[in-house]
From Swiss-Prot:
It comes from Methanothermobacter thermautotrophicus (strain ATCC 29096 / DSM 1053 / JCM 10044 / NBRC 100330 / Delta H) (Methanobacterium thermoautotrophicum). The gene is rps3. Residues 16-85 form the KH type-2 domain. InterPro entries: KH_dom (IPR004087), KH_dom-like_a/b (IPR015946), KH_dom_type_2 (IPR004044), KH_sf_prok-type (IPR009019), Ribosomal_S3_C_sf (IPR036419), Ribosomal_uS3_arc (IPR027488), Ribosomal_uS3_C (IPR001351), Ribosomal_uS3_euk/arc (IPR005703). Keywords: Ribonucleoprotein, Ribosomal protein, RNA-binding, rRNA-binding. Residues 203-245 have a biased composition (Acidic residues). This is Small ribosomal subunit protein uS3. The keyword rRNA-binding applies. One of its GO terms (molecular function) is structural constituent of ribosome. The lineage of its organism: Archaea, Methanobacteriati, Methanobacteriota, Methanomada group, Methanobacteria. Binds the lower part of the 30S subunit head. The keyword Amino-acid biosynthesis does not apply. One of its GO terms (biological process) is translation.
Length: 258
C-alpha cells in the first residue's frame, strides 16, 4: 500500500536523523535532508562545523556513508555537507547548546534568557524555549520562556516555525529542551503593510520646458511694462501741450484787454 510506503520512508528518515544527531553532536548538527535521485540517494547534512563532519582526509564522512548504506539500506548514498549560515537561527543547534550549558551546571533561567537574547539578536521574529524535568527539586516541572512574536497553531506554525529538541542527563534526572524559532524572512498571511505615498519627480525635459515657459512669461511682463511706460509718456506730452495752449490763450486775452 502507498500509505505504508510513506510511513516506512518517514520512519527511516527519522532513524537517519537520530543517528546523525548522535554521531555529529560535537560538530553542531543542524539537521539533514534526503533527496532521491536517479544516481542514488543524496543526504545533505547541515552542520555548524563542517570540518568535523568531513574528518581528516574524509575519514568521518566515508564512515557515515558506509553506515547509511549498510544500516539503513540506502541505495548508493552520497553525503554532502553544508555549513549553517546563522547557527543562532537553527533550533537544533541552539537546543544542544542549551543542553551543554545545563550539563555544565548553569541555572536554567540564565541559560534560557541568554540563548533567547542571542537568537533575537540574530534577527529572529520570535523564540520559545521550553525546559522540562527535575529543574527545581525532586518533582518534575516545566519552564517556558518566550520572546518576540511566534505562531502557536495553524498552517503558519507548521510551515514557518522551526523546531529543535535535545536531552541532557543530570544527577536529578533527564531534562528535555525544546526550542521553537520563527525566522526573520517569514511573511505571515495576515500581515498588512501601509506604503507611504509616492512622490513623482519631474523629468529633466519637463523641467526645462517649464523654465522656458517662465522665461517667456517674464519677457511678456517686461513688454507690458514697457508699453505702459510709453503710454504714460504719451499722456504726459499731451498734458504739456494742453498747458502751453492754455497759457497762450491767457496771454492773448490779456493783450486784447490792453
Amino acid at each position: 500500500m502507498i500509505e505504508k510506503d510513506f510511513v516506512v520512508e518517514g520512519l527511516r528518515r527519522t532513524r537517519i536523523d537520530e543517528y546523525l544527531e548522535k554521531e555529529l553532536e560535537r560538530a553542531g548538527y543542524g539537521g539533514m535532508d534526503v533527496q532521491v535521485t536517479p544516481m542514488g540517494t543524496m543526504v545533505v547534512v547541515y552542520a555548524e562545523r563542517p570540518g568535523m563532519v568531513i574528518g581528516r582526509g574524509g575519514k568521518t564522512v566515508r564512515a557515515i556513508t558506509q553506515k547509511l548504506k549498510n544500516k539503513f539500506d540506502l541505495e548508493n548514498p552520497q553525503v554532502e555537507v553544508k555549513e549553517v549560515d546563522v547557527p543562532e537561527l537553527n533550533p537544533k543547534i541552539m537546543a544542544h547548546k542549551i543542553a551543554a550549558m545545563l550539563q555544565r551546571g548553569m541555572h536554567f533561567r540564565r541559560v534560557a534568557y541568554t540563548t533567547m537574547r542571542r537568537i533575537m539578536a540574530a534577527g529572529a521574529q520570535g523564540v520559545e524555549v521550553t525546559i522540562s524535568g527535575k529543574i527545581r527539586g525532586a518533582r518534575s516541572a516545566t519552564a517556558k520562556f518566550t520572546d518576540g512574536y511566534i505562531k502557536k497553531c495553524g498552517e503558519p506554525s507548521v510551515k514557518h516555525v522551526r523546531e529543535g529538541f535535545a536531552t541532557v542527563q543530570l544527577k536529578p534526572g533527564v531534562l528535555g529542551v525544546y526550542v521553537r524559532i520563527m525566522p526573520p524572512d517569514v511573511v505571515l498571511p495576515d500581515k498588512v503593510e501601509i506604503e507611504d505615498p509616492r512622490v513623482t519627480e519631474t523629468p529633466a525635459e519637463e523641467a526645462s520646458e517649464a523654465s522656458e515657459v517662465v522665461e517667456d512669461l517674464e519677457e511678456v511682463e517686461d513688454l507690458e511694462e514697457i508699453e505702459d511706460l510709453e503710454e504714460v509718456e504719451d499722456l504726459e506730452e499731451v498734458e504739456d501741450l494742453e498747458d502751453t495752449e492754455a497759457e497762450k490763450k491767457d496771454a492773448d486775452g490779456e493783450e486784447s484787454e490792453k
